[in-house]
């Protein structure tokens, strides 16, 4: 999956917004809470939040590491898009979205 495919997938999720942070990172957010971050410059790099179980499983795969500064919150960083299939990318980014959604106020959740 490339940056454009990630962007297309994320923007189809309800109430997703995008913005550029830290100069060159494209952030996908739900109610101002990030759930996926991709680098706009340099080599491919994408990070997303995952469950404790998925974090342990994914970080055992070569090419997937705990995300710098965000690992304590169970974010992973991927530098080679081919380590996951397109279906896996969509599954894990979708799960990241759901994890963020579950932490938002119930009123917001019900509005979706």
State where each predicted segment sits.
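Charge-dense, helix-prone N-terminal extensions
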Residues: 1-112
